[in-house]
From Swiss-Prot:
GO CC aspect terms: plasma membrane
NCBIfam families: cyoE_ctaB, PRK04375.1-1
Subcellular location: Cell inner membrane
Catalytic activity: heme b + (2E,6E)-farnesyl diphosphate + H2O = Fe(II)-heme o + diphosphate
Record membrane topology: Multi-pass membrane protein
Organism: Shewanella putrefaciens (strain CN-32 / ATCC BAA-453)
Chief location category: membrane
Protein EC: 2.5.1.141
Pfam families the UniProt entry points to: UbiA
Gene name for this UniProt entry: cyoE2
Pathway annotation from the record: Porphyrin-containing compound metabolism; heme O biosynthesis; heme O from protoheme: step 1/1
Family statement: Belongs to the UbiA prenyltransferase family. Protoheme IX farnesyltransferase subfamily.
Protein name as catalogued: Protoheme IX farnesyltransferase 2
Free-text function comment from the UniProt entry: Converts heme B (protoheme IX) to heme O by substitution of the vinyl group on carbon 2 of heme B porphyrin ring with a hydroxyethyl farnesyl side group.
């Protein structure tokens, strides 16, 4: 009874909530969608549920680990930013050593699941993505270079590739398109955040593009990267990995996102509101494409099966 009371106490609930928060559940959820999209794109309707579950759980734990370790690394700059000043690693509600141990334990568990159930290539991408995010981006590039976003975009693009390679076990054109597509998406998404959180980044002396080189250059880069993202996204249907439904969705969302980005050049634009709109629609875009590439891939598989069966009957 005492044990049950202890677990129900406000202190324990607050501590549990703190451990959940350092894993950044919103980021985990977004990555779950992209992992599933990559997996189902490669599976084309022939889904191994055990493999899919292992890919989702394993990669989610790896992402959670990276986020927790990032909280430990960033605690000094988080203290200077209004948005992050209440994090438990800043307030001291949970000891940094405990958060680090928790994060590393999640990583070991996540990588172990991927190693046991997926394949060497999927595991390799997960490891490289983790090293880039924690070791290269968080420890150095974020604090010291305007190119930090470009480096970080690679790790952000890894989850759908892990999902895809879990099925195929090879780095083919589909995996390459996904890697490039999601890397390109990360950049305008991140620059939009940096614009509407400009004061936070400036206070922490983080050299993101809007802070280091100004709004004009940041707006130009947002427009250019969205335009290239739209072209690269169209490669999936053009290369035969998805069908007309994905092409329709990618054209509609990408062009709308691009039109929204171009509004940043209006003389009467509210730059903060505009950046939030660009950021918000970036989430809608990548979610829509992740879901559509999974569903459209299955439709193509069914069409192929149907045509094969008909051919057999006629023969």
């Amino acid at each position: 009874m005492q044990t049950q009371d202890r677990f129900m106490s406000p202190q324990w609930k607050a501590r549990f909530k703190g451990y959940v928060q350092v894993t950044k559940p919103g980021i985990i959820f977004g990555n779950l969608i992209s992992v599933a999209g990559g997996f189902l794109l490669a599976a084309k309707g022939d889904v191994n549920l055990v493999l899919m579950l292992a890919s989702l759980v394993g990669l989610s734990l790896v992402v959670a680990s990276g986020c927790a370790v990032n909280n430990c690394i960033d605690r000094d700059i988080d203290a200077k930013m209004q948005r992050t000043s209440k994090r438990v690693t800043v307030t001291g509600e949970i000891a940094v050593g405990n958060v680090l141990a928790f994060g590393l334990a999640l990583g070991v568990l996540g990588f172990s699941i991927l190693a046991l159930f997926t394949n060497a290539l999927a595991l390799l991408f997960a490891v490289i993505g983790y090293i880039v995010y924690v070791g290269v981006y968080s420890l150095y590039m974020k604090r010291n270079s305007v190119y930090g976003t470009l480096v970080g975009s690679f790790s952000g693009a890894v989850p759908p590739v892990v999902g895809y390679c879990s099925v195929t076990g090879q780095m083919d054109m589909g995996a390459a398109i996904l890697l490039l597509m999601f890397s390109l998406w990360q950049i305008p998404h991140s620059y939009a955040i940096a614009i509407f959180r400009f004061n936070d980044y400036a206070a922490a002396n983080i050299p993101v593009l809007p802070v280091a080189e100004g709004m004009t250059k940041a707006k130009l880069h947002i427009v250019l990267y969205i335009a290239v993202f739209a072209l690269v996204s169209a490669l999936l249907p053009l290369a035969g990995y998805t069908g007309i439904a994905f092409m329709a969705v990618t054209c509609a969302t990408s062009l709308w996102w691009l039109a929204m980005a171009l509004k940043g050049y209006r003389h009467d634009v509210d730059i903060q509101r505009w950046a939030r709109q660009v950021f918000g629609f970036s989430i809608i875009t990548i979610m829509a494409l992740s879901i559509t590439m999974a569903l459209d891939s299955q439709v193509i598989k069914e069409q192929v099966i149907g045509q094969t069966s008909l051919f057999t009957l006629v023969k």
